[in-house]
């Protein structure tokens, strides 16, 4: 007595589905282009160019050295006072009054770097 074709199909489908679920799929990366900046990859953080409105998204090419620069820390090649914000021990960020006086713009607070 032969097994009905539909039952065979069903079993095959179940087996295929089990195999598919058992298989480890590679992590899916986000699409590598964005609609607003087609040349840039999406996992590179986008640059916000409206600097006068947004102090928190700045270009990576800043005039002052990056935070937590290990080599600079080792060589002591820069002063911490040339940063607009500092991270205190409690984990909060404070504006740096020293930077306001001695930063790239001197006393001109309305000029963004």
Curated annotation (Swiss-Prot):
Location (main, coarse): mitochondrion
- Keyword field: Meiosis, Mitochondrion, Transit peptide
Please name the GO terms of the biological process aspect recorded for this protein, alphabetically.
meiotic cell cycle
What GO cellular-component annotations does this UniProt entry give?
mitochondrion
The lineage's top-level taxon is: Eukaryota
The function of this protein is: Has a role in meiosis.
This protein is called what? Meiotically up-regulated gene 98 protein, mitochondrial
Organism per entry: Schizosaccharomyces pombe (strain 972 / ATCC 24843)
Gene symbol here is mug98
